[in-house]
UniProtKB/Swiss-Prot annotation:
Domain of life: Bacteria
Enzyme Commission number: 3.13.2.1
The protein's name in its UniProt record: Adenosylhomocysteinase
InterPro entries xrefs: Adenosylhomocyst_ase-like_sf, Adenosylhomocysteinase-like, Ado_hCys_hydrolase_NAD-bd, NAD(P)-bd_dom_sf, S-Ado-L-homoCys_hydrolase_CS
Enzyme kind, highest EC tier: hydrolase
Stored Pfam families: AdoHcyase, AdoHcyase_NAD
Broad class of the protein's primary localization: cytoplasm
Reaction(s) the record says it catalyses: S-adenosyl-L-homocysteine + H2O = L-homocysteine + adenosine
Co-factor remark: Binds 1 NAD(+) per subunit.
Gene3D superfamilies xrefs: Adenosylhomocysteinase-like, NAD(P)-binding Rossmann-like Domain
Subcellular location per the Swiss-Prot or TrEMBL entry: Cytoplasm
Keywords linked to the UniProt accession: Cytoplasm, Hydrolase, NAD, One-carbon metabolism
HAMAP family: AdoHcyase
Length: 492
């Protein structure tokens, strides 16, 4: 699809509005979804536990999260627990079109008569299309019944509502600056266009929303920034820092999907190659471990001496980008920060070396600088480009245009690890929806006993057998026999 923001319109069938690539892919998507359900014991356990209670009845959840097969299982878990849902992807390349089709058609519908959930997502959206989809996800058919919950990944949905409300109260949407990113210009353009037609839209939504649950590190950072500025208009649960999310999805999911993305994108042998991983947080740890497991010679960049020391204890060299970029065969950014690999670094890379990002946003690699550099871009296949510099003749392989390569070049994290993350998301939605009066407009984390609940489900699914504390042992440790077993400050 190459239409512009102004020419897009939703499709409607059987009372469901949606915009996806191909509704006929639903059968394929449903088959993969059924397989994923067997690999997602956390979500299936929550369906069994809460199906009769319907704890999310009355919730109108606007979800912005990668529209994958695994997310399809999450969406249908939310609806099984009573929620109404509208969905968009949080990345222009991450949608799996057959998964989107399966969700729209639903388990009991057909492409001719869909009975599922409105989805606005397809693989390969433009920036204008992406933000149009985000607005559709937040715009419910009955304006008197707007979204009352947000499920977010990266914070774009939350930002759209909160910035929209902020600008409505100010009476003006600020103009874009010349050096603003292309995406920010599109974002402001959308808000400006909507301000002209509906000056109170975002304020109305913000006042209706009872809470947001946030999936990832960068989105959590945005939440804390909104809270510190006094601009957070509803409670938020930081799902990312649940142990069963950050220590599993971020590390073990990345360990699986990074290799998958590089293999599908390039078919390059990793063993023996020099690899530079920028950032050694939970995601960076998964990246480094994955590359080491393939036989690569791995170096790491870090700003934090504690993380740097951890890397060295694992046998990784800690270097600067400037020191290592010229020798690296593969470079992966995983910092959650901006301006990590700049144009001068890219120009210093070896001929036909591989450059990719696995942080949530596309600002870790200076793609704008690369586009302005005069380098020639040759598309090899979807989300794989060869950039050639005329002055040196050297070429660099860039994956997914600097966006998430594990979702752009592959299919993201495997179902089992996402079952941990999405079980946390579901529990967090239930928590905010059913106990809303217990939360202020601040950022919270799920209590430890719920973290342990998610872990226990998955230990049992893998055939593990947990040791049971005696009453005397529990008293000795100062904990309950049934947990929680660790204080909040325990780092795992």
């Amino acid at each position: 699809m190459t239409t512009t923001e102004t020419s897009l319109s939703a499709d409607t069938k059987n009372g469901i509005d949606f915009k996806i690539a191909d509704l006929s892919l639903a059968d394929f998507g449903r088959k993969e979804l059924r397989i994923a359900e067997h690999e997602m014991p956390g979500l299936m356990s929550l369906r069994r536990e809460y199906a009769e209670v319907q704890p999310l009845k009355g919730a109108r959840i606007s979800g912005s999260l990668h529209m994958t097969v695994q997310t399809a299982v999450l969406i249908e878990t939310l609806t099984a627990l009573g929620a109404e849902v509208r969905w968009a992807s949080c990345n222009i390349f991450s949608t799996q079109d057959h998964a989107a089709a399966a969700v729209v058609v639903g388990p009991h519908g057909t492409p001719e008569e869909p009975k599922g959930v409105p989805v606005f997502a397809w693989k390969g959206e433009s920036l204008e299309e992406y933000w149009w989809c985000a607005e559709q996800m937040l715009t419910w058919p009955d304006s008197d019944k707007p979204a009352n919950m947000i499920l977010d990944d990266g914070g774009d949905a939350t930002m759209l509502v909160l910035r929209g409300m902020q600008y409505e109260k100010a009476g003006v949407v600020p103009p874009a600056e010349e050096d603003d990113s292309a995406e920010w210009k599109v974002f402001l353009g959308l808000l400006r266009s909507r301000f002209e037609t509906d000056k109170g839209k975002w304020t109305k939504i913000a006042e209706s929303v009872k809470g947001v649950t946030e999936e990832t590190t960068t989105g959590v950072l945005r939440l804390y920034q909104f809270a510190e500025a006094g601009d957070l208009a509803f409670p938020a649960i930081n799902v990312n820092d649940s142990v069963t999310k950050s220590k599993f999805d971020n590390k073990y999911g990345t360990r699986h999907s990074l290799i998958d993305g590089i293999n599908r994108g390039t078919d390059a042998l990793i063993g023996g190659k020099k690899v530079l991983i920028c950032g050694y947080g939970d995601v960076g740890k998964g990246c480094a471990e994955a590359m080491k497991g393939q036989g690569a010679r791995v170096s790491v960049t870090e700003i934090d001496p504690i993380n740097a020391l951890q890397a060295m204890m694992e046998g990784f060299d800690v270097v600067t980008v400037e020191d290592a970029i010229g020798d690296a065969d593969i470079v992966v950014t995983s910092t959650g920060n901006k301006d990590i690999i700049m144009l001068e670094h890219i120009k210093a890379m070896k001929d036909h070396s591989i450059l990719g990002n696995i942080g949530h946003f596309d600002n870790e690699i200076d793609m704008a600088g690369l586009e302005r550099s005069g380098a020639t871009r040759t598309n090899i296949k979807p989300q794989v480009d060869l950039w050639t510099f005329g002055d040196t003749g050297r070429s660099i392989i860039v994956l997914s245009e600097g966006r998430l390569l594990n979702l752009g070049n592959a299919t993201g994290h495997p179902s089992f690890v996402m079952s941990n993350s999405f079980a946390n998301q579901t529990i967090a939605q239930i928590e905010l929806w059913t106990k809303n009066d217990e939360y202020d407009n601040e950022v919270y984390r799920l209590p430890k006993h719920l973290d342990e609940k998610v872990a226990r489900i998955h230990v049992e699914a893998l055939g593990g057998r947990l040791t049971k504390l005696t009453k005397d042992q529990a008293e000795y440790l100062g904990v309950d026999v049934e947990g929680p077993y660790k204080p909040d400050h325990y780092r795992y």
